[in-house]
C-alpha cells in the first residue's frame, strides 16, 4: 500500500513526508518485545517500496510504545532521507523530560520531529514549544477531539457525560 501512496504523492511539494506507522506497538501488548524486534525490518521493507517510486520525500520512523521507545532501532543508515518522529503528552514541559529523544537524535545524527503535542494547559504548551524550539525539534500541535481543554476543536461535555463514560 505504501508504494501506491508514494506513487500518488511523489511529485507533491506540499507533502512533508511519509509517517509510516503512527504509534506502533502499544506498551500493554503481551508480546511487545517480540513485536518491537519486527518494527525495524518492517520500516526497511516499506522504505524500499517507497523508494521504488519516490526518491525525494522524507520518511518518518515512529518508535514503538506511543512513538517513545527508540531502543529497538539499531540501523538507520539504509536511506538518506529518514527522520525520527516522537510524541509527547503531559509530563514536565522542560528539556530534561525529553532528553531521551534529544540524545537518541544526536547519537544517530538524524532529525527528530515531535509529531504530536497537545491537550495541556496554555502555560504548558508555551513552555513546551519553547523547549522544542531550543532543542531544534520541529513539532505539530495536535489537540483535536479534546474535552474541557484549550484546543482547535473540542466539546463541552453534555449533561450526564460521566454516566456515559462510566458505562
Q: Which positions does each model-derived feature cover?
A:
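Extracellular glycoside hydrolase catalytic/binding regions
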Residues: 3-146, 151-166
